Amino acid sequence: MYRTDFASRALAVAVLVGLLAPGVARAQAIIPGETGTTFNLTASTGYITSADGGSLYTWGYGTGAEMQYPGPTLIVNEGDTVTVNLTNTLPVPTSIVFPGLEGVTATGGAAGSLTQESTGPGDVVTYTFTASNPGTYTYRSGTRPDLQVDMGLAGALIVRPAGYDAISNRTAYGHPDSRYDHEYMFMLSEMDHRIHEAAELAVTPADFAAIDTSNFRPTYWFVNGRTAPDTLFPSSYPLFPYQPYGSFVRGKPGDRILMRIIGMGNDMHPLHAHGENSTVIAQDGRLLASGPGAGADLAYSDFTISIVPGGTMDSIFQWTGEGMGWDIYGTGAGYEHGTCTSDQFNADDVVNNDTGMVTADGNGNGYADGDGFHDVTWEYCADHGKPFPVTLPGLLDLAFGGFYSGSPFLGHDDALPPGEGGLNFNGGYHFMWHSHNEKELANFDVFPGGMMTMFVLEPPGTPIP
């Protein structure tokens, strides 16, 4: 059954209050999921919630008796022989396909149009493959995907490269071009509530066969199975027992943030990251390389990444503040933050921050030239000490958002009227990351919502797990 009370404003407040509550975990820059080589998934029915108070009858995969949306993220290592056992408690046959993975074998069940299908609880299908190539993948129903993917039968699969280490060797593809400091998943999907209502009311095989998806018209859009502003809650937050994955992003200047983007639904979606372009390094589980060992030499920079259904893309987002034209840490009394010098004795900029290697002495003066950024804080040295280019209006002439610290300078806060602000813990910069298809920023026509989350740029030194 679908219901809504259009309580988006109240729920948005609840989200933000929840983020402030003592004991609530902050967003973590590591992707949660299931690890191992054998995964026992059950396809079952349940309900998920939307941020406007709606409840949607849903089908999903889970590791126990209860489904989740999206399905559990499966995390394996390059070279692993992986086994996925599918048990089906749905009222219709179902299956799993693994786009981009080679040599998948299926045993048990009954023959379907794309792969073996499970027809009921006692009919387990086993899928086996070797995780030969590292990267980001998806898995989804291979049985009438026009219906079953919209109903929720999809999830993510990550293949870690050989030699991966979560502390000392974070790469997505085993090549330095794919190194990162933090990683986040963006599983983009949509639902048409009319299809879900029809599936909930269906009883006989003929009823399910009669569900018409040709007039597919989504009314909800999701990031990792949640609609905004629910996307801002941490993963495993108790309000969302069947939607465990959050998508709130955190990083510091210079951090390389790996965006694992998946087209989990049946529509194409353009994901737009405010704040800086990102560099697309891989597509469909393959590094954008001209040949073996070339690295991501075919990578490209873009401000909006369009992801197709069933496809995946990996992109590196890195915010440095280069070329802002003013000192983002402030100038004058109260904003002292040392020096930012290059190409001289005792300079702050000696190494290439991305590689950690001392830079060359190109002009022959005996000092490393540097890369233009402070070796510790990533401050862009050319802007050090440059004043803020405008005079800020007085408080009476401003309207405030909850994430405004009262100061334009990173890591600082300033006076605000009573009741304003309060959601910016560290004086960070907040940017919206969202679909660039504006109609997807709504929950059942209630704006704002839908396919939207936030990125907060934290000041240097802020711990990010």
Give the location of each predicted region.
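Copper-binding active sites and cupredoxin-like electron-transfer domains
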Residues: Y2-F6, R26-P465
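Bacterial N-terminal signal peptides
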Residues: A10-P22
